[in-house]
Swiss-Prot record:
Gene that produces this protein: gly-11
Name of the protein in its database record: Putative polypeptide N-acetylgalactosaminyltransferase 11
Disulphide-bridged cysteine pairs: C149-C383, C374-C450, C494-C515, C541-C553, C578-C594
Gene Ontology terms describing biological process: protein O-linked glycosylation; regulation of Notch signaling pathway
GO cellular component terms, A-Z: Golgi apparatus; Golgi membrane
Amino acid sequence: MLLLWRRKTVGLICLFSILLTIYLYVSMYPEDNERVWNSGNADIQRKHEKLNNGGQGRHDFDDDEGAEKDEEDAVEKQNIAAPPLPKSFTTFPDRSKEIEIDTDLLGKINGKAEDDLQVEGYKKYQFNGLLSDRIGSRRKIKDSRNARCSSLTYSDSLPAASIVVCYFNESPSVLIRMVNSIFDRTKPEHLHEILLVDDSSEWSNATDEAIKYREKHIIQWEKVKFLKTDKNEGLIRAKIFGARRANGEVLVFLDSHCEVNEEWLPPLLDQIKQNRRRVVCPIIDIIDAITMKYVESPVCTGGVNWAMTFKWDYPHRSYFEDPMNYVNPLKSPTMAGGLFAIDKEYFFEIGSYDEGMDVWGAENVEISVRIWTCGGELLIMPCSRVGHIFRRQRPYGIKTDSMGKNSVRLARVWLDEYLENFFEARPNYRTFTDYGDLTSRISLRRNLQCKPFKWYLENIYPELLPDNTPNQLNNQILVAGKKYLIKMANGTHCLSAENSQGRIANGNRVEMRKCNHMERMQQWKYSSTNELRPMGSSRMCLDSLRGISVILCHNQGAHQMWQVSNAGKLYSRSVNKCATGSNDVSALSTLKFCSLANSFQFVEL
């Protein structure tokens, strides 16, 4: 009985304590006594959308309407006033080593003061500034590399890099954590210096706190140097400002809201050591602007549309049939622009950035085209990964249409006879004249003996070529049940199924052989389901899944369905490419974008 009485007494005391706590809390915040304070990330999302006034900023650069709207918003939006250092930064955890961080737990909001701090962070940075401050000076992130990356080796004598980081009105915690991620995941011999370039921010919080942090951690931060532009130059000219003051053999440009991953730098430096004309980029992983979680990105390459805006492209699924392609260098027609490495001397040899461009926008596409057409290479390294906070929109406004002006400069200098394609994509810039003097950039192109833009389209990015998809298909050229020689127009060679002693094996290639109407391997029967079957084996079909080959017929159409355009192009809709060939002895038939493919004559037998 005594034990039971004690348990009841303890229970009543606990209940009384809880009720007293609730009473005191409600008394302190009577105006909010019906509000739920323990909001998680769903509540954060709603606040973020509210702060953006329902606006949808761009994540991808291939949204033309979004690009134009972003430009208009940039012109109309005014710079926000300089606020004081967030109170959340006064408890910024300074850690000596990386630890696992539970961002879900840290993201909880308790009380009106924290709620106000969170709202303030979104207004200032367009990401969760409060959560960033709580995460602290360093954290452990997921190693997002493919497992094969850890077995790769690199040269023992790699060049040392100057890392150039430009920022404007940045969060102190994000900037400090980025620098620490570099020190924690970079070998000292690979790092010459880190240049933090303050592009005349409206408030000096990030620089001031980073300087204080360096004073406390002078041994580790010894290689950090602080630079400041005389006036706000914009990202493009701020990068040039930093590059001119760098002393390392290689320049590595990083955005200020990044965290580098394990062994991120050797894959970049190794390619430049092999060929100083190589410009190399990491895979850009995502740091979620709301949850601050580190999210792995797939392997992809940079592309562009006729509006000259950047977009991401994904390699064809057949590319990864070789598992090593998850780690091999990948040629990229363009780069996103914020994160890349380049030999310092080569950067200035090819003209650095176009200093006639303003602030940011299109400079990444311009330098990409220049690299490829003027003798360089642009690669993406899957074993180098850097996380980047993708914000919905910039946290500050600009008073000029920099994206539009810069795109016009790019188009008028580099597009040659394809300039009209740009104006068709962006007709509002056809009469735009305030793009500045182009004389020096045209002279640079001539002095570097750069190839024409047509070469870039045909050899680097044929996806952009006009007429890649046949506009008109002719259903009268091939008739079901008939047999044909498929002969190159104005040529002497025909499509011929590869065989061994007259037998065609599943997966055999298709060769270009001198035409012989008696040769059964050159006779192709067209079926009612648009298949082309070699008479040497009626069970096989011409297939486009892995290039041009002969595969067992599956009667499903898809890669075994062929049509002919009015121009005589043999077209596979499933891969949106056409068969092509040559008159070279024993050449193989391949797939190309239709604008680059040969025309054929279909000779009925």
